[in-house]
Amino acid sequence: MSNTPLPSSFDAHPEFFQETKWQKFTRRIKEEPLIPIGYAATSYALWRAYKSMKAGDSVELNRMFRARIYGHAFTLFAIVAGGIYYGQERRQRKEFEKALQQKQDQEKRDAWLKELEIRDKEDKDWRQRHAAIEMAAKEAEKKRG
């Protein structure tokens, strides 16, 4: 049996590979850069609202609360639009991850079965050796007796 991997429908897609959490994070930011921008805008508006509240500037406070709402709306829009735009790719990635998990599970199962077969063979060999030794002992006893 050769060690070459079986062909896969994911071979044509080099972006499908096992990735670390950091790689996934950077990939997702690259795929949907508007979401972090929305988070940043919302956070900045909240920070400015906090500063305005501490300074007692109610006009700026209300303006920043409105900016926070706009930041939330922008972020929500980016999430929904990105979900629609990248929906098919996410389904493919989930299929790939499921196939990868099944492959890993099958490899574990195959390794376990191989180990059981090796142990079974060792046990049979031991029994055959033991039976041969026992027969040789009986024959030696017959010759002596």
From Swiss-Prot:
Record membrane topology: Multi-pass membrane protein
InterPro entries: Hypoxia_induced_domain, RCF1
Keyword Transport attached: no
Any one GO BP annotation for this protein: mitochondrial respirasome assembly
Coarse class of the protein's main subcellular location: mitochondrion
Gene Ontology CC, one term: mitochondrial membrane
UniProt keyword annotations, A-Z: Coiled coil, Membrane, Mitochondrion, Transmembrane, Transmembrane helix
Subcellular location: Mitochondrion membrane
Coiled coil: 86-144
Spans through the membrane: 33-50, 69-86
PROSITE patterns in the record: HIG1 (PS51503)
Residue stretches making up the HIG1 domain: 6-97
Protein family membership: Belongs to the RCF1 family.
Function recorded in the entry: Cytochrome c oxidase subunit which plays a role in assembly of respiratory supercomplexes.
Assembly and interaction partners: Associates with the respiratory chain complex III/complex IV supercomplex.
Name this polypeptide is given: Respiratory supercomplex factor 1, mitochondrial
Native source species: Ajellomyces capsulatus (strain H143) (Darling's disease fungus)
